[in-house]
Swiss-Prot record:
This is 3-deoxy-manno-octulosonate cytidylyltransferase. Pfam families: CTP_transf_3. The keyword Cell cycle does not apply. It comes from Flavobacterium psychrophilum (strain ATCC 49511 / DSM 21280 / CIP 103535 / JIP02/86). Disulfide bonds: none annotated. Keywords: Cytoplasm, Lipopolysaccharide biosynthesis, Nucleotidyltransferase, Transferase. Activates KDO (a required 8-carbon sugar) for incorporation into bacterial lipopolysaccharide in Gram-negative bacteria. InterPro entries: Cytidylyl_trans, KdsB, Nucleotide-diphossugar_trans. It is found in: Cytoplasm. One of its GO terms (biological process) is lipopolysaccharide biosynthetic process. Its EC number is 2.7.7.38.
Amino acid sequence: MKIIAVIPARYASTRFPAKLMQDLGGKTVILRTYQAAVETNLFDDVFVVTDSELIYNEIITNAGKAIMSIKEHESGSDRIAEAIQNLEVDIVVNVQGDEPFINKEPLEEVIQVFRNDTHKKVDLASLMRNITHKNDIQNPNNVKVIVDQKGFALYFSRSVIPYPREENVGVRYMQHIGIYAFRKQALLDFYHLPMLSLEASEKLEQLRYLEYGKRIKMIETTHVGIGIDTLEDLEKARSML
C-alpha cells in the first residue's frame, strides 16, 4: 500500500497573508512543515501542492517535491485531487501547511484505519476530540461531528449538534480535527462531483463526501495541532524553537 502526504499551500490567506513564507527560526513555515512531514518516516513520498511560484520554488530549491496547481479551487480536497490524479498511490494524507510542529501520532492513527480496513469499507479517515466547554461547543469555527456506533461520521456542522433539548443524557460533543487520509478514488470522485446544498450552506467540504455516500471513519484523539493563523501564532511558534 503506497501512502503519500500532500500539503496544500495557498499563498493568499484572509487572516494572515503570505503566512507560509514567514520566517520561523531561519526557515519558512512551509519548508518546516514539509521537512517535518518527511521526517515522520510515515510516507513513501511528500508533496507540497501550491498555486504560488514563490512557495513552489521555496520547496524545490531546498531539495523538496512540489506540484503547481493548475486551476483555482474551492477546497483543499479539490486542489489535492488535481495534483494526485496521475500519481500511483493508494492512500493520500492531507497535512496542513501551517502546522510546522507535526505530531506523528495522529497521522499514524488515520493511516492505521486503512491498514485495518481489509474489506475496503472506509473511504476517508479523520480525527475528532471531545470538547466540554460551552463556548467551544457553541463556537461556529469549531466544527462538530456526530458519529454512529462504529465511529462513522453521520454529519458535520458549525451548529451545536446534537441540540441539547435534554441535557442530562450523557452526550459527548466532538470537534472535528482537520487531518484527513483518503483513498485515491474517493478524492477523484470528490473532484468530479458538483457541490450540493449542505456543503454550500455550511462551507464544509467534508459534507460533499457524505452527501454522495462516502464513508468517513472518525478516530478520537487528544491531539491539538499548533497552527499559524495570525502574527501572534507566529510569535508563539518562534518562542517554541
